[in-house]
């Protein structure tokens, strides 16, 4: 099933049609396309699903023909958050497509793990075990397989997980709660131990994230400092996920390490772009916007695009906007 094969005439809702046109138009500013995407994501993720859910999923998938790796990777992420099997064929196709950008394929594989359906195991295992695939694809599929197996296991039912402040479906759940108070040094040790499975290390990562939110939690700064050490990990995939978590947390203690990651020209593009977007979510802190503007002409396209989106997000933060999204009014939607 081709992501571009959906028929726009099937999409009757004028709001979805308008958002789809913005999202798929290469002449629209990137920030506006991202806002359209997040509006569609809201509709695609509604639980229980409504009559707008499937058209919204199809509208998101229609933009996989874009040349923008940044946009396509965000499409995949959004589809992975839908909890809807209608997203599976689009994501499976992108994950397998070796012509697609590696960052986009990685995000599609991660999204299949987030959806948690066992139908995806065959594809993910094949990619994980294919030595011709880039390391980031193999590592992503390794984590995604473990997540799906965990999602469908009896062991999961026995685990007690801390209630998270975050509604995102993550590549791994946090470590299960124990009778004793969580020890940040112990969790940090798991986070940084490269001999352990990536899935377990990701569980430590998300456990630390949850100990860092809200930012005035007594454990928050120490948890952020522990996470920051992960930005020195040998795995680019791991480093990029640390930056993503920092974007969720919006904790000022992460600004120095994010700035260092973005400024490092030898760092992987997927890490630098995630650092840029994370800084965008911290845009109301002094000096952050100035830092981002330095990279508007970066040699790497995905970094330039991320800075554009990050500055757009920072502008929304400054203006006190409730949600980073595009809401067409009735007149525009009907146009």
Curated annotation (Swiss-Prot):
One cellular-component annotation, GO: cytoplasm
Name the pathway it acts in.
Protein modification; eIF5A hypusination
Q: Tell me where on the tree of life, at the top rank, the source sits.
A: Eukaryota
Q: Which residues bind Fe cation 1?
A: 73-74, 106-107
Provide the reaction this enzyme catalyses: [eIF5A protein]-deoxyhypusine + AH2 + O2 = [eIF5A protein]-hypusine + A + H2O
UniProt keyword terms in alphabetical order: Cytoplasm, Hypusine biosynthesis, Iron, Metal-binding, Monooxygenase, Nucleus, Oxidoreductase, Repeat
Q: EC number(s) in its UniProt entry?
A: 1.14.99.29
Task: Give me the HEAT-like PBS-type repeat coordinates as residue ranges.
Answer: 71-97, 104-130, 200-233, 238-264, 271-298
Gene Ontology terms for molecular function: deoxyhypusine monooxygenase activity; metal ion binding
* InterPro entries for this protein: ARM-like, ARM-type_fold, Deoxyhypusine_hydroxylase, HEAT_type_2, PBS_lyase_HEAT
User: Which amino acid positions bind Fe cation 2, per UniProt?
Assistant: 240-241, 273-274
- Where is the major localization of this protein? cytoplasm
Q: Which cofactor does it need?
A: Fe(2+)
Cofactor annotation comment: Binds 2 Fe(2+) ions per subunit.
Q: Does the keyword Metal-binding apply?
A: yes
Question: Membrane-spanning residues where?
Answer: none
Compartments reported by the entry: Cytoplasm; Nucleus
* Function (record text): Catalyzes the hydroxylation of the N(6)-(4-aminobutyl)-L-lysine intermediate to form hypusine, an essential post-translational modification only found in mature eIF-5A factor.
Q: Which family does it belong to?
A: Belongs to the deoxyhypusine hydroxylase family.
Can you name this protein?
Deoxyhypusine hydroxylase
Species per Swiss-Prot/TrEMBL record: Aspergillus fumigatus (strain ATCC MYA-4609 / CBS 101355 / FGSC A1100 / Af293) (Neosartorya fumigata)
Organism classification: Eukaryota, Fungi, Dikarya, Ascomycota, Pezizomycotina
**Which gene is transcribed and translated to give this protein?**
lia1
């Amino acid at each position: 099933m081709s992501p571009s094969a959906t028929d726009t005439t099937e999409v009757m809702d004028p709001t979805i049609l308008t958002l789809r046109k913005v999202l798929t138009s290469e002449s629209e500013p990137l920030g506006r396309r991202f806002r359209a995407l997040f509006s569609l994501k809201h509709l695609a993720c509604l639980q229980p699903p409504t009559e707008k859910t499937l058209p919204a999923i199809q509208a998101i998938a229609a933009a996989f023909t874009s040349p923008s790796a940044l946009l396509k990777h965000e499409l995949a992420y959004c589809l992975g958050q839908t909890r809807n099997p209608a997203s599976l064929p689009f994501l499976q196709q992108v994950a397998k497509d070796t012509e697609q950008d590696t960052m986009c394929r990685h995000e599609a594989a991660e999204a299949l793990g987030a959806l948690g359906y066992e139908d995806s195991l065959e594809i993910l295992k094949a990619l994980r075990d294919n030595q011709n695939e880039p390391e980031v694809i193999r590592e992503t599929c390794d984590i995604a397989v473990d997540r799906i197996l965990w999602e469908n296991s009896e062991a999961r039912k026995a685990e007690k997980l801390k209630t998270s402040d975050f509604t995102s479906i993550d590549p791994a759940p946090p470590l299960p709660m124990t009778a004793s108070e969580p020890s940040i040094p112990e969790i940090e040790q798991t986070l940084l131990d490269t001999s352990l499975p990536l899935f377990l290390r990701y569980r430590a990562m998300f456990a630390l994230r949850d100990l860092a939110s809200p930012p005035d939690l007594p454990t928050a700064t120490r948890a952020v400092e522990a996470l920051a050490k992960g930005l020195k990990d040998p795995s680019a995939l791991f480093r990029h996920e640390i930056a993503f978590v920092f974007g969720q947390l919006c904790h000022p203690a992460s600004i120095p390490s994010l700035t260092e990651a973005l400024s490092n020209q030898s760092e992987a593009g997927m890490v630098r772009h995630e650092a840029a977007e994370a800084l965008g979510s911290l845009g109301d802190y002094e000096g952050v916007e100035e830092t981002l503007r330095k990279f508007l002409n970066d040699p790497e396209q995905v970094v330039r695009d991320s800075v554009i989106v990050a500055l757009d997000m920072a502008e929304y933060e400054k203006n006190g906007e409730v949600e980073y999204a595009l809401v067409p009014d009735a007149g525009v939607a009907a146009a």
